[in-house]
A protein has these predicted regions:
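Short, flexible loop/turn elements at secondary-structure junctions
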Residues: 14, 23-25, 70-73, 87, ...
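N-terminal pre-Walker A segment at the start of P-loop NTPase domains
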Residues: 14-54
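P-loop NTPase nucleotide-binding core
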Residues: 2-20, 56-194
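Conserved Walker B catalytic segment
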Residues: 171-242, 246-253
Length: 267
């Protein structure tokens, strides 16, 4: 039986740095299995052959999130960077946004704002370019889509907070639903200007910001489950699970405290 040989290459001084493989070099790398599986999933979600008639559309999951999970130094970031690099070479129909770093995510800047901000940066670059009448009109429509998302984003920060009234609670719910629709509309308008069919969003080290990891995961689930979008994340599953567990504990303790206050008022 022929043995499959994988190459492990070390560069002095760069042993712990992520590597960025291309469409040829990744095949003989130790990370080839993980990268190949991710490429296969993206091909399954978004076939490169547009002439293929698919009869399995109902089997394509709505939640198209791909995760590279493992301990520190196991190659998660390398997989993420290599995947983007390979898709840049192979798939001209996919819009590849700059990788989001949760280090910039805090109580004043959530994950959705970072993603929208990355898209808006490209939008500003397009505005500086020469454009014909048709492209100008497309950029105007895209600008309106950004404004709509920005209005809905204003309510996200208070989503998990206790509302002062049932009316405010309903307003928050309506804004949450509205944001999901406005983000989808923004992605569609963005892809038209970019002249791409699909979008790939990559988020590295999602578990590093442990105190806000649960909120990041929830916002991805709520607002980025979009037909034309694949989200790729890298992180340590145990640390992410622990962060989510702690968030549920804090929420449960808050509910218990509210219940105790309500009991005292009614007694």
């Amino acid at each position: 039986m022929e043995r499959l040989v994988k190459t492990l290459t070390f560069k002095i001084g760069e042993e712990t740095r992520p590597v960025k493989l291309n469409k040829d070099s990744y095949k003989d790398n130790l990370l080839s299995a993980q990268i190949s599986k991710a490429l296969g999933l993206i091909e399954e979600f978004f076939p490169s052959d547009k002439t293929t008639i698919r009869d399995d559309l109902d089997d394509i999951p709505a939640n198209k999130t791909i995760s590279f999970l493992g301990d520190r130094g196991t190659g998660k970031s390398s997989c993420l960077k290599s995947l983007v690099n390979i898709l840049t070479e192979k798939r001209k129909d996919i819009c590849l946004l700059e990788t989001i770093e949760p280090a910039f995510f805090d109580k004043h800047r959530n994950i959705m704002e970072l993603i929208i901000g990355t898209m808006f940066g490209k939008y500003e670059d397009w505005l500086d370019e020469q454009q014909d009448a048709n492209r100008h009109n497309l950029l105007v429509e895209l600008g309106y889509a950004f404004q709509e998302v920005k209005r809905d984003l204003q309510y996200i920060e208070s989503e998990c907070c206790q509302e002062d009234s049932e009316l405010e609670d309903l307003q928050g719910l309506a804004s949450s639903i509205g944001l999901s629709a406005s983000v989808k509309k923004l992605v569609d308008a963005f892809l038209i200007v970019e002249k791409k069919d699909y979008m790939l969003i990559t988020i590295d080290d999602i578990d590093l910001n442990a105190s806000l990891a649960f909120e990041m995961a929830e916002q991805i689930r709520k607002y980025l489950i979009i037909d034309k979008v694949v989200v790729c994340i890298a992180g340590k599953s145990e640390q992410l699970s622990d962060a989510i567990r702690q968030s549920y504990i804090r929420l449960y303790e808050l509910l218990l405290e509210q219940d105790r206050k309500s009991t005292r008022l009614n007694s």
